[in-house]
A protein has these predicted regions:
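Basic- and hydrophobic-enriched, low-structure N-terminal and domain-boundary segments
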Residues: 1-60, 64-65, 69-80, 298, ...
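A short helix-turn-beta junction within AAA+ P-loop NTPase domains corresponding to the substrate/partner-engaging
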Residues: 108-113, 329-341
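P-loop NTPase motor domains
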Residues: 12-17, 32, 57, 68-312, ...
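Conserved AAA+ ATPase core "coupling" helix
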Residues: 346-354
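H-loop/switch region of ABC-family ATPase nucleotide-binding domains
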Residues: 318
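Conserved P-loop NTPase motor module
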Residues: 1-6, 194, 252-253, 369-419
Length: 419
């Protein structure tokens, strides 16, 4: 199994005492007056949903701030509604969160996965509220991801879909018979075996390249008995280390994982809520997400759009505002909280696009000039409906060893237990 065996033990969360509190993450302090600027991800009076965009050119402190946000979320689990545990899945394209960064692994108790025998099954049918013909939907989603990355044609797409359906049938799973769906689902190795043994299928095209990549690299676990639910796997911080792999392989892994995550999210219970507070269950962080976002994979947008109901938030980190796209590729409409560091190629239209300032030229110009002039570990923050504010960041290195959370505003520092 690819789980790092010697990852740091996850910090223990204090048991919930029944009091509903606000989870609080300190972005930093306002440059203007030093006041704390915070994010309240479970308080719907502050942010309707917890999706966030973090932007900044290389070297501006973007990764340090992102690590700080993740670490603080881990430490704030005690304030989650009902004391629900919080899982955070990180797609790490550059190796900024893996075992070569022991301070982060130690602070968060992160487990690191490498793309070898990943212990989940993209053809799994697990869940408590499953849609009709679920095996067909699952097979079609996997096929669509492969087709997008490897530019498959209609015939190749149909061929792959047929192989997956045949694999389900070989496992005794019938698409129209929900009573069969709890049987062990086929693994990718079983799908590949059906594909490779079918002499009628052409083997020198882009479909072959895709199947061969997945099989030769042994990315997915081939033994169904050694796989688990992805939702169950994402407990605490889980880092998927994609560094050193080709872009096609990286995007394929992220696409397959997000599609499975979305399916299992949809098949799970809605998160609890009480008045203004909503239970958070999981976060997804896609680091250096621009290449993946450009391919418009449906699962990412669906998670952004529908995750709130299930207590799921998404954090997208990129180097440019324009990576959030426009038209069919518009991700900005799903983001309520923005952290913008210095951006080297910033345009005024980028500011209007993200901050919706086209009707307020004065504010747009202020933001444009502010983003262009801020220094390292400084950012412009817009959280929910609050006005944008320029802050001195709270980077990860400042809080890594401060498990008492003394960096929080005084009213939010954890109470000392009674003697």
């Amino acid at each position: 199994m690819s789980v790092q065996e010697e990852s740091a033990p996850a910090p223990e969360a204090e048991p919930w005492d029944g009091r509903i509190r606000t989870m609080q993450v300190l972005f930093g302090r306002a440059l203007e007056d030093g006041r704390p600027v915070c994010w309240y991800p479970n308080d719907t009076t502050c942010v309707f949903h917890p999706n966030m965009g973090i932007i900044g050119t290389m070297g501006t402190g973007k990764t340090q701030l992102t690590k700080s946000v993740v670490t603080q979320l881990c430490r704030q689990r005690r304030n989650n509604f009902d004391g629900h545990p919080l899982g955070i899945l990180i797609f790490d394209y550059k190796g900024d969160y893996n075992e070569t960064k022991p301070e982060f692994v130690q602070a968060t108790g992160a487990r690191v996965l490498t793309p070898y025998h990943l212990p989940f099954n993209p053809f799994s049918l697990q869940g408590i509220r499953r849609k009709p013909m679920l095996p067909i939907h699952t097979a079609n989603a996997f096929t669509d991801n492969i087709a997008r990355i490897y530019n498959l044609g209609p015939k190749q797409t149909t061929t792959l879909l047929g192989c997956i359906i045949s694999a389900y049938q070989a496992c005794g799973i019938q698409a129209a018979a929900p009573s069969t769906w709890d049987r062990p689902a086929p693994t990718f190795d079983q799908v590949y075996e059906i594909y490779s043994k079918d002499d009628s299928i052409k083997k020198n095209d882009s479909l072959y390249a895709a199947m061969d990549h997945l099989y030769k690299f042994q990315i997915l676990e081939g033994d169904a008995r050694r796989t688990t639910s992805l939702f169950e796997l994402v407990n605490g911080v889980v880092v998927m280390d994609l560094s050193g792999y080709d872009a096609d392989i990286q995007n394929l892994i992220v696409a397959i994982t997000l599609e499975l995550f979305y399916s299992q999210m949809q098949n799970s219970q809605s998160s609890l809520a009480d008045k203004d507070f909503r239970q958070l269950t999981r976060f997804i962080l896609v680091d250096e997400a621009d290449n993946f976002m450009s391919q418009n994979f449906p699962a990412l947008k669906r998670i952004l759009k529908e995750g709130r109901e299930f207590g799921v938030g998404t954090i997208l980190s990129t180097q440019s505002l324009r990576h959030f796209g426009s038209g069919d590729g518009d991700y900005s409409s799903y983001i309520l909280s923005w952290v913008v560091h210095n951006v080297s190629d910033l345009k005024r239209s980028d500011v209007d696009f993200v901050f919706k300032t086209s009707s307020d030229p004065a504010t747009a110009e202020m933001l444009y000039q502010g983003i262009k002039s801020i220094g390292k570990h400084q950012s412009v923050i817009k959280a929910g409906n609050a006005a944008p504010v320029t802050v001195q960041d709270t980077p990860f290195w400042q809080i890594a060893e401060d498990t008492a959370e003394s960096y929080l505003p005084e009213s939010e520092v954890p109470e000392e237990p009674e003697a």
